[in-house]
């Protein structure tokens, strides 16, 4: 299992022997930003936000305790409003401190009810901060493709209150299991602890691999040639069953039996698909797991205390992906759901999510 203990349990020089978690194959990939010249992309950073902050580009390393501004290019987003980590400083070669902001008004990672922010914002912030560090601190080139092997997040939903949304989030980061390829980065694990106003909010860890454009083209050449081919948009289930307030944010479609859904892929969604892609992004699969758990359990809101996901292969855009759920226990205080994604008879990912019990919304499927 991924390491989720206190950050103090990890030393600065802890590295993996193989640079890849055991029993992992391929995984969900975060594409490099698209550029007019695909073989030589360049990331440009805006001017510093203030005299005390700098900006970073891939291949640069910040000074100890220097504060650096996060750009949307480093975070692989296309709009500033989708970038959650705002700045960071380097404590040592493998320890960093980020500041993040979680807007209560974000169109996708917004409120889940009248009191709570969306716990999924923790995983997305971890994902973005990991890519920022890979580029700016560990020499991953601008055109790197990032491969997510696993992601684990634990949260305290009572600390994810809308009333605290204006407060900055402080994130302590340890990078471990670092594997180099030449001077660049091959893979690493990031472990993060999130606090707001001094209170523990969440802890998360994930392992990521780096793939060069050449290797990625060898691996995904056929799928890359199909980028831009229309993907049929399936009808979604009712938003309230998926734990969403807007129909356009639903990533589940009805299937032919109870407890099973089809992945609904909307390649025009501005947050889930900010740029053309050759596969379903990992954040879409993570969201599909949460929505499946909400629909299967009938819990509303479904506020995950723990979420784990392991990715086995790419989720393709042009083939049906089944999401199968299993309720694991009947604890009176909480509910745990296992979600398995399968495509063409093969496992794509597995996820397990646990939430406190709340009012139930019954699903007709």
Show the residue positions of the predicted features.
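Non-catalytic linker/capping segments at the edges of enzyme domains
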Residues: 1-114, 209-272, 364-365
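Basic, ligand-binding patches in group-transfer machinery
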Residues: 5, 283, 361
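Active-site helix/loop of acyl-thioester processing domains in fatty-acid/polyketide metabolism
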Residues: 117-145, 280-302
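A cross-family "folded-core" feature that marks the main globular domain of proteins
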Residues: 145-148, 154-163, 206, 218-221
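A short glycine/small-residue-enriched secondary-structure motif
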Residues: 98-104, 142-152
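Mixed-charge, glycine-accented linear interaction segment located at domain edges/termini
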Residues: 180-226, 336-365
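Hydrophobic beta-sheet segments that form the core/acyl-binding groove
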Residues: 151-197, 305-347
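Acidic/His-leaning functional-site neighborhoods
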Residues: 247-322, 338-340
């Amino acid at each position: 299992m991924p390491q989720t203990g206190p950050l103090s349990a990890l030393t600065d020089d802890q590295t993996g022997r193989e640079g890849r978690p055991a029993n992992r194959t391929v995984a969900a990939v975060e594409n490099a930003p698209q550029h007019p010249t695909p073989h030589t992309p360049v990331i440009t950073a805006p001017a510093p936000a203030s005299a005390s902050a700098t900006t970073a580009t891939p291949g640069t390393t910040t000074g100890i305790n220097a504060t650096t501004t996060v750009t949307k290019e480093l975070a692989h987003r296309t709009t500033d409003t989708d970038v959650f980590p705002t700045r960071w400083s380097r404590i040592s070669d493998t320890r960093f401190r980020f500041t993040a902001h979680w807007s209560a008004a974000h169109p996708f990672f917004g409120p889940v009810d009248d009191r709570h922010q969306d716990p999924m914002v923790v995983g997305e912030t971890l994902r973005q901060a990991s890519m920022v560090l890979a580029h700016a601190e560990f020499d991953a080139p601008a055109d790197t493709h990032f491969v997510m092997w696993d992601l684990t997040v634990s949260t305290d939903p009572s600390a994810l209150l809308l009333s605290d949304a204006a407060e900055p989030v402080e994130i302590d980061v340890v990078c471990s299991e670092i594997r180099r390829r030449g001077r660049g980065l091959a893979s690493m694990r990031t472990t993060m602890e999130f606090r707001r106003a001094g209170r523990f909010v969440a802890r998360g860890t994930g392992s990521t691999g780096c793939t060069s454009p050449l290797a990625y083209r060898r691996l995904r050449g056929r799928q890359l040639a199909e980028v831009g081919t229309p993907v049929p948009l399936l009808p979604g289930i009712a938003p309230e069953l998926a734990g969403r307030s807007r129909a356009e944010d639903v990533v589940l479609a009805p299937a032919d039996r109870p407890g099973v859904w089809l992945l609904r892929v909307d390649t025009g969604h501005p947050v889930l698909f900010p740029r053309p892609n050759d596969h379903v992004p990992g954040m879409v699969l993570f969201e599909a797991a949460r929505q499946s758990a909400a629909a299967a359990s009938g819990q509303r809101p479904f506020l995950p205390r723990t979420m784990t996901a392991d990715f086995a292969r790419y989720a393709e855009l042009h083939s049906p992906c089944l999401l199968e759920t299993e309720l694991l226990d009947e604890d009176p205080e909480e509910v745990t759901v296992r979600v398995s994604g399968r495509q063409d008879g093969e496992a794509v990912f597995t996820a397990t999510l646990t939430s406190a019990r709340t009012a139930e919304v019954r699903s007709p499927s």
